[in-house]
Amino acid sequence: MSGHSKWSTIKRKKAKIDSQRGKVFTKLSKEIIIAARNGGADPNGNMRLKAAIEKAKIANIPNDNIQRAIQKGAGGGDGANFEEFSYEGYGPGGIAILLNVATDNRNRTAGEVRHILSKHGGNLGETGCVNWMFDEKGIIIIDRSEVNMSEDDIMLAALEAGAEDVKVEDDSFEISTAPEDLQSVKTALIDQGIPVADADTTMVPQTTVKLQGEDAEKMNKMIELLEDNDDIQEVFTNYEEE
């Protein structure tokens, strides 16, 4: 998550989907498999699976693919043996990097991550070295172009639903919640006729750091390569883009 608005980041990622649809399908299918493996095949009783299915539908993954991924995860067959863990490290200028990984080959992934970081002025760190710089939050995005309510009404509805804060951006409202309250706040907003453009848990940096010149170029390239890696599900940093 960069210093730009979360909605801007989401739209930037969605713009890449058409050119990298195969990678997007792979990552979202993997998330569905893991969610079904850990919590069962019924999305009504498995919030992680429900969220993964919603992401897959937004990315236009065919329903047949979604169902196959659910069956693969719930059945525990081949392809369901992904290991989940996090890597922590640093980018140029001491930027904090937190990576959520799901892989069937830890050694391969470690080598690839280490190579990407070291080639662009960063390095892997020990467990816990940067995690403390982030807070886990639920983030709900409301696209301003999709609602006719005033800022005050949106903020009041969100806070009454249990949100912690509402950030007003040029093109969106970014509503933050405790992770465990994400689904209930989202449901309450939808029930009031407020369309939700995106909702997910994320790691929010407590403070952000700006880079300039060569360091900024290296950091941008590093993030691009990390996000493109099939084994890396999520990339979080405290880097604030100019």
Swiss-Prot record:
One CC-aspect GO term: cytosol
Entry superkingdom: Bacteria
InterPro entries noted in UniProt: Integrase-like_N, TACO1_YebC-like_2nd/3rd_dom, TACO1_YebC_N, Transcrip_reg_TACO1-like, Transcrip_reg_TACO1-like_dom3, YebC-like
Keywords assigned by UniProt, alphabetized: Cytoplasm, DNA-binding, Transcription, Transcription regulation
Presence of keyword Transcription: yes
One Pfam match: TACO1_YebC_N
Annotated compartments: Cytoplasm
Molecular function terms from GO: DNA binding
Disulfide bond annotation, renumbered to this chain: none
One of the GO biological process terms: regulation of DNA-templated transcription
Broad class of the protein's primary localization: cytoplasm
Family: Belongs to the TACO1 family.
NCBIfam families on file: PRK00110.1, PRK12378.1, YebC/PmpR family DNA-binding transcriptional regulator
Protein name from the UniProt record: Probable transcriptional regulatory protein Dred_1658
UniProt organism field: Desulforamulus reducens (strain ATCC BAA-1160 / DSM 100696 / MI-1) (Desulfotomaculum reducens)
